[in-house]
Structures are given as C-alpha cells and as structure tokens.
C-alpha cells in the first residue's frame, strides 16, 4: 500500500448569460477540489458560496440550491436528469450555470 495522496478532483465551472457577474466576471474556472472527499453538486454550491461568489449571493443561491432562473448543465446535460444536488462530480466534469433572469 502506497502512501500516495488522493489526486484532486479537477472540474471546470462555466458561467453564462450574466451569471458570471456574480463570480468576479470570470466566465470559466478550472477547479482542483480535495479528492479525498465525495463532491456532490450540493457540496460544490456550498464551496462556491464560501470561496468564489463575490456579488449578491441571493441572485444565485436560494436555501441549499440555486435559485429559480439559474439553469445548471453538467457536461451539456440538464442537471434535473442527473439527480440535481445529489449528482456526484466526476473528474473533468464541466458544470455550466446560465442565468435566465434578465432585468427589463
């Protein structure tokens, strides 16, 4: 048994249609998350809120989930088909958040 550390979980976060404005106006981020723990979308949202959400959290987070009007695609698939908050992130997953909320 080697004493190798668990490799980080590398994923890509993308933000579109205005969602990036809540995250320092950065549209794409590559993350290396602690590979020793299981990462679900619920855990990812908590991490995002604590670490990279810079503006008006209420426009992105509502309770433990994203607020209505934020679309979440995981590898181009609607997260509703993948279990939403329960989805377990896999290496090289691409998670895209799109805001459908636009001011008038």
Swiss-Prot record:
Q: Where is this cross-link: Glycyl lysine isopeptide (Gly-Lys) (interchain with K-? in acceptor proteins)?
A: 104
User: What is the primary gene name for this protein?
Assistant: Urm1
The protein here is known as Ubiquitin-related modifier 1 homolog
Q: Which UniProt keywords apply?
A: Cytoplasm, Isopeptide bond, tRNA processing, Ubl conjugation pathway
Which PANTHER family does the record associate with it? RURM1 PROTEIN (PTHR14986)
Enumerate the Gene Ontology biological process terms. Answer: negative regulation of JNK cascade; protein urmylation; tRNA thio-modification; tRNA wobble uridine modification
Pfam families per UniProt: Urm1
Q: Which residues carry this modification: 1-thioglycine?
A: 104
The protein's PTM annotation reads: C-terminal thiocarboxylation occurs in 2 steps, it is first acyl-adenylated (-COAMP) via the hesA/moeB/thiF part of the MOCS3 homolog, then thiocarboxylated (-COSH) via the rhodanese domain of the MOCS3 homolog.
The record's comment on protein family reads: Belongs to the URM1 family.
Role: Acts as a sulfur carrier required for 2-thiolation of mcm(5)S(2)U at tRNA wobble positions of cytosolic tRNA(Lys), tRNA(Glu) and tRNA(Gln). Serves as sulfur donor in tRNA 2-thiolation reaction by being thiocarboxylated (-COSH) at its C-terminus by MOCS3. The sulfur is then transferred to tRNA to form 2-thiolation of mcm(5)S(2)U. Also acts as a ubiquitin-like protein (UBL) that is covalently conjugated via an isopeptide bond to lysine residues of target proteins such as Prx2/Jafrac1, Ciao1, Eip71CD and GILT1.
Q: Which residues form the signal peptide?
A: none
**Where, subcellularly, is it found?**
Cytoplasm
Q: Which organism is it from?
A: Drosophila grimshawi (Hawaiian fruit fly)
């Amino acid at each position: 048994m080697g004493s190798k550390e668990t490799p980080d979980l590398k994923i890509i976060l993308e933000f579109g249609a205005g969602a990036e404005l809540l995250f320092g106006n950065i549209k794409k981020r590559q993350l290396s998350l602690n590979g020793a723990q299981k990462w679900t979308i619920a855990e990812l949202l908590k991490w995002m809120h604590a670490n990279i959400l810079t503006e008006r959290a209420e426009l992105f987070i509502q309770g433990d989930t994203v607020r209505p009007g934020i679309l979440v695609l995981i590898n181009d698939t609607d997260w509703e088909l993948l279990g939403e908050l329960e989805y377990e992130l896999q290496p090289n997953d691409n998670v895209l958040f799109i805001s459908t909320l636009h001011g008038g």
